[in-house]
């Protein structure tokens, strides 16, 4: 009997598409492109000319896992501060340039690892591309062409009427072509919009038409909650399709929060090694413990742990034991006490007021025992940063 195809695939499709192949760039010591891990960026909120404050915030971002940092350069005093910042920053510094093309050259001379230019608002930018290309090429640094919906070139707006995906892409590729004409191709591109739907379509079109590394971002995303949702939806859609090489979550919040969200997005898609993961139930009428408080206290106690640990915090006996057994460490709470599970086995039962302390102690013990042997026979340090 001949085989009949029912159109059923041999196996499940991959959850994520392969990374889109791009050209490779180096932003300082951080590779950007399909041959490198997806990096997480942020931008300082200090006045750049306040060198000490800016470096202090960069240090905080670095400690939070930031790979690349961008600083604004709106004034001459800011440009004058760039050499000190670029020299002392522990991570690569990108100068963000708007309006004044002269600051592009200042940033290059200052030793910045890259420059972001907004062609929509830099005076006579097209006429200065040859000079910029030569300066960046001589310095061996890349340039990001950062197109924003709110500052599109007038010519593009006259053609399209508004910031459509096609308008964003045309603007970016036009500027890139000018650099290419002068033999410069170390280019990354972003096409940001505050509407995730428009933004996603713009990046899809851009990915189909070029091999430039893409910096993902939703511009003016909003306060922490709203911005987190917008960026997560947009980045998740694109990254699942293999599109995106570096990301910046824009939030009206402490920039450290941008790093936390970006890092979690990548971890959730298995695009970055998972670290601490707290699994907790949403609570309901069956809960016999304050799950919200318990989960928050455990999260706070283990914040910064550099170890892939899954901790389950459950509030009743319905899903609690099952979830706790599937985790590296967990608690199933009820009747004023908690059963502590390690690798699926109950190791002890403790009073409710000792649950948090016990979970933290057990987490540290597991981390020390399971994979923190950096050198055989030598105990490695458990890192929990605050």
From Swiss-Prot:
Enzyme class: oxidoreductase
Keyword Iron-sulfur listed: yes
Molecular function GO terms recorded: 4 iron, 4 sulfur cluster binding; 4-hydroxy-3-methylbut-2-en-1-yl diphosphate synthase activity (ferredoxin); 4-hydroxy-3-methylbut-2-enyl-diphosphate synthase activity (flavodoxin); iron ion binding
The keyword Transmembrane is annotated on this UniProt entry: no
Cofactors, names only: [4Fe-4S] cluster
Residues binding [4Fe-4S] cluster, per UniProt: 281, 284, 316, 323
Record-linked Pfam families: GcpE
Family: Belongs to the IspG family.
Protein name according to UniProt: 4-hydroxy-3-methylbut-2-en-1-yl diphosphate synthase (flavodoxin)
Organism of this sequence: Corynebacterium jeikeium (strain K411)
């Amino acid at each position: 009997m001949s085989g009949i195809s029912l159109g059923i695939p041999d196996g499940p499709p991959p959850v994520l598409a392969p990374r889109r192949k791009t050209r490779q760039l180096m932003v300082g010591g951080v590779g950007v492109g399909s041959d490198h891990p997806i990096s997480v960026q942020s931008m300082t909120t200090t006045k750049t000319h306040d060198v000490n404050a800016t470096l202090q915030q960069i240090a905080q971002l670095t400690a939070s896992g930031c790979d690349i940092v961008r600083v604004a350069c709106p004034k001459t005093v800011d440009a004058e501060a760039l050499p000190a910042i670029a020299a002392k920053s522990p991570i690569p510094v990108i100068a963000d340039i708007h309006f004044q093309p002269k600051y592009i050259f200042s940033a290059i001379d200052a030793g910045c690892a890259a420059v972001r230019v907004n062609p929509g608002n830099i005076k006579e930018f097209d006429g200065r591309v040859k000079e910029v290309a030569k300066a960046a090429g001589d310095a061996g640094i890349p340039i990001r062409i950062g197109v924003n919906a709110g500052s599109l070139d007038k010519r593009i707006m006259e053609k399209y009427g508004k910031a459509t995906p096609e308008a964003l892409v045309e603007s970016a590729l036009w500027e890139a072509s000018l650099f290419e004409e002068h033999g410069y191709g170390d280019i990354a591109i972003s096409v940001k919009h505050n509407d995730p739907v428009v933004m996603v379509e713009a990046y899809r079109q851009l990915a189909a038409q070029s091999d430039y590394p893409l910096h993902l971002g939703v511009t003016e995303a909003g306060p922490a909650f709203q911005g987190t949702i917008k960026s997560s939806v947009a980045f998740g859609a694109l990254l699942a399709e293999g599109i995106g090489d570096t990301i910046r979550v824009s939030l009206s919040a402490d920039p450290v929060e941008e790093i936390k969200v970006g890092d979690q997005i990548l971890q959730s898609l298995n695009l970055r090694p998972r670290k601490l993961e707290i699994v907790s139930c949403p609570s309901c009428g069956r809960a016999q413990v304050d799950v919200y408080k318990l989960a928050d206290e455990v999260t706070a106690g283990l914040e910064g742990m550099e170890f892939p640990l899954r901790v389950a915090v459950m509030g009743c006996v319905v899903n609690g034991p099952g979830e706790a057994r599937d985790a590296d460490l967990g608690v199933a709470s009820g009747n004023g006490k908690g059963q502590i599970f390690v690798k699926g086995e109950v190791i002890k039962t403790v009073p409710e007021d000792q649950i948090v302390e016990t979970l933290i102690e057990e987490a540290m013990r597991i981390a020390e025992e399971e994979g923190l042997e950096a050198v055989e026979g030598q105990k490695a340090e458990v890192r929990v940063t605050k």
